[in-house]
């Protein structure tokens, strides 16, 4: 039996797209801001990825699989950057969408969600007893100070099921640590950062010799888009920290809670 995969990359349809186009994402993005982030820029990226992979075996894969297949090949950096950006932006939009939009005149009303006990417990275990409010402040600080240009802010879960904060420059991915781009190599780096890069290089070399590939089980739990187009329309040049705070204060916890490993098969 022949199995056909899709050969073109398109922006996924959102169940409440009409309300989002009209009202935006409450407390985070205006209708125009959301239109830019999702309907305009995501479509632009999808069109570029379609052209970049046309006629190749990669064209039939989803962006997630494309970024994994191209992350280790410098000759495919263009394709990797497009696929990684598409996937990251999908993660971002997914975790800010309102849980539900009520029908009627007050279409801005949403169902409030809360972080699960498992999430809050993992936060305390992973950050030396700190609560979520403290971790949020740390995420805001690191977004402002570690990503000076374009990039992404993540809260991720590693292979030991511990949570940690990851900042990625440009189109870095949390799934493959040699390409998470947590350091901006276009500028000077500290001695500690150099030591980390050296350790990473040694680990990559060791892993490659053992089985020919690098294994990374890091999974993103929260994603914030730090690219200029995501916030400039609504927040202006000097208010990226306010934007990040609004995102972290208004997450769709139904989505975030489901991203955490619970150890229970569903």
UniProtKB/Swiss-Prot annotation:
Gene3D superfamilies (alphabetical): Iron/manganese superoxide dismutase, C-terminal domain
InterPro entries: Mn/Fe_SOD_C (IPR019832), Mn/Fe_SOD_N_sf (IPR036324), SOD_C_sf (IPR036314)
Biological process (GO), any one: mitochondrial translation
One Pfam family named in its UniProt record: Sod_Fe_C
GO cellular component, one term: mitochondrion
Keywords: Mitochondrion, Ribonucleoprotein, Ribosomal protein
Alphabetized GO MF terms: metal ion binding; structural constituent of ribosome; superoxide dismutase activity
Main location: mitochondrion
Recorded superkingdom: Eukaryota
Location of this chain's protein in the cell: Mitochondrion
Subunit details: Component of the mitochondrial small ribosomal subunit (mt-SSU). Mature yeast 74S mitochondrial ribosomes consist of a small (37S) and a large (54S) subunit. The 37S small subunit contains a 15S ribosomal RNA (15S mt-rRNA) and 34 different proteins. The 54S large subunit contains a 21S rRNA (21S mt-rRNA) and 46 different proteins. mS42 forms a heterodimer with mS43, building a large protuberance adjacent to the mRNA channel exit in the mt-SSU body.
Any further remark recorded for this protein: Present with 2060 molecules/cell in log phase SD medium.
UniProt similarity note: Belongs to the mitochondrion-specific ribosomal protein mS42 family.
Function of the protein: Component of the mitochondrial ribosome (mitoribosome), a dedicated translation machinery responsible for the synthesis of mitochondrial genome-encoded proteins, including at least some of the essential transmembrane subunits of the mitochondrial respiratory chain. The mitoribosomes are attached to the mitochondrial inner membrane and translation products are cotranslationally integrated into the membrane.
The protein's name: Small ribosomal subunit protein mS42
């Amino acid at each position: 039996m022949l199995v056909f995969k899709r050969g073109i990359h398109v922006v996924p349809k959102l169940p409440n797209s009409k309300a989002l186009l009209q009202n935006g994402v409450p407390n985070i993005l205006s209708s125009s801001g959301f239109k830019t982030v999702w309907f305009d820029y995501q479509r632009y990226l999808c069109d570029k990825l379609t052209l970049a992979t046309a006629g190749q075996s990669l064209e039939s894969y989803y962006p997630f699989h494309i970024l994994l297949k191209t992350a280790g090949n410098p000759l495919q950096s263009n394709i990797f950057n497009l696929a990684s950006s598409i996937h990251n932006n999908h993660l971002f939009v997914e975790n800010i969408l309102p849980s539900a939009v009520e029908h009627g005149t007050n279409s801005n009303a949403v169902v409030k969600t809360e972080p699960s006990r498992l999430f809050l417990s993992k936060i305390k275990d992973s950050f030396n007893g700190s609560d979520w409010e403290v971790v949020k402040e740390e995420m805001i600080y690191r977004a402002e100070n570690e990503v000076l240009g374009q990039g992404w802010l993540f809260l991720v879960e590693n292979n030991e099921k511990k949570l940690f904060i990851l900042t990625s420059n440009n189109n870095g991915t949390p799934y493959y640590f040699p390409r998470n781009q947590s350091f901006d190599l276009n500028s000077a780096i500290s001695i500690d950062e150099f030591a980390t890069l050296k350790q990473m290089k040694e680990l990559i070399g060791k892993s490659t010799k053992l089985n020919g590939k690098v294994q990374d089980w890091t999974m993103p739990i929260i994603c914030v888009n730090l690219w200029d187009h995501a916030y400039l329309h609504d927040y202006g040049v000097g208010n990226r920290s306010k934007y990040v705070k609004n995102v972290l204060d208004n997450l769709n916890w139904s989505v975030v809670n489901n991203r955490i490993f619970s150890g229970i098969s569903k």
